């Protein structure tokens, strides 16, 4: 069922954005069950803050002073369950770039040296849990020029990596995505032939979150994706499809994670007429091979 994980493409707050400051590159097919994308760009003077929404992903981020030839900041940002803004570090008179790997929430553990427990909404040095990967990336990041070259190198490192694979964790992701986050915790555990308590421990260690939180974030993202793609036409359809108790319940959950009224977002999406088919998130040439 790895195809379910490969097909799962969570979206950011600006899914159609592709500029010099922010661009995304898909990984090769072999990594798509674990890696959402490589992303980065050049921060221009007066760059505005970036809006952040829960995308059910974790990021390994490097900010690079291209002028001085040094990494000025590196961090691992765990899965987030809040919306907000992020600011890029800027140095007057210097060119600053960003390079990052965006892991699926259920894929980061495969490249980590330690458990991801406690990383929800976390911000820490890559050395804490990704020491081996961090050292391999730092070895060549500075000598490579541009996002495409850095993404290609990072991809080669990840492909050669001795991953920590756990079939039960991967099956848990398949079940979660198959139900779009709507299954109860007991139903989820039953499909895995384990207890709810075992599921709680499993996800805490490998995903850094509880089953309840994982379900809520996937349900929000699946709903958000459908609105962006234009496959949901109104709030009433969304309530039924995603098993919300009523419209008020859906509105509360959407506002909690998106910071916006869902009815207004439906209207804005329809007025913009922006669908995934018309505005693909990734230019075709930016899919890695």
Describe the role of every protein-language-model region.
Residues 1-173, 177-180, 184-186, 192-196, ...:
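Alpha-helical bundle regulatory/interaction domains
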Residues 202, 217, 252, 268:
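Residue-level "edge-of-site" marker
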Residues 205-209, 253-263:
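A secondary-structure capping/hinge motif
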Residues 186-189, 200-205, 212-215:
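Long, low-complexity intrinsically disordered regions
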């Amino acid at each position: 069922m790895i195809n379910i994980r490969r097909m799962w493409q969570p979206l950011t707050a600006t899914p159609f954005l592709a500029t010099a400051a922010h661009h995304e590159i898909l990984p090769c097919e072999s990594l798509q069950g674990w890696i959402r994308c490589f992303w980065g760009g050049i921060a221009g003077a007066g760059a505005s803050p970036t809006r952040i929404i829960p995308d059910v992903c974790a990021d390994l981020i490097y900010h690079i002073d291209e002028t001085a030839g040094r990494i000025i900041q590196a961090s691992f940002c765990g899965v987030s369950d809040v919306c907000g803004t992020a600011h890029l570090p800027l140095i007057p008179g210097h060119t600053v770039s960003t390079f990052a790997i965006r892991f699926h929430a259920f894929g980061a553990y495969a490249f980590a040296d330690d458990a991801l427990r406690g990383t929800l909404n976390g911000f820490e040095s890559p050395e804490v849990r990704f020491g081996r990967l961090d050292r391999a990336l730092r070895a060549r990041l500075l000598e490579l020029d541009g996002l495409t070259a850095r993404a290609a190198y990072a991809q080669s490192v990840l492909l050669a990596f001795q991953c920590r694979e756990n079939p039960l964790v991967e099956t848990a992701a398949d079940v979660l995505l198959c139900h779009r986050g709507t299954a109860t915790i007991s139903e989820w555990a039953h499909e895995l032939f384990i207890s709810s308590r075992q599921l709680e421990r499993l996800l805490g260690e490998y995903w850094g979150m509880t089953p309840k939180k994982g379900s809520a974030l996937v349900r929000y993202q699946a709903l958000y994706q459908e609105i962006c793609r234009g496959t949901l036409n109104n709030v009433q359809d969304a309530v039924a499809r995603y098993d919300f108790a009523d419209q008020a319940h859906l509105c509360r959950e959407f506002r909690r994670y998106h910071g916006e009224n869902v009815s207004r977002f439906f209207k804005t999406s329809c007025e913009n007429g922006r669908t995934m088919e018309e505005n693909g998130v990734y230019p075709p040439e930016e899919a890695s091979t």
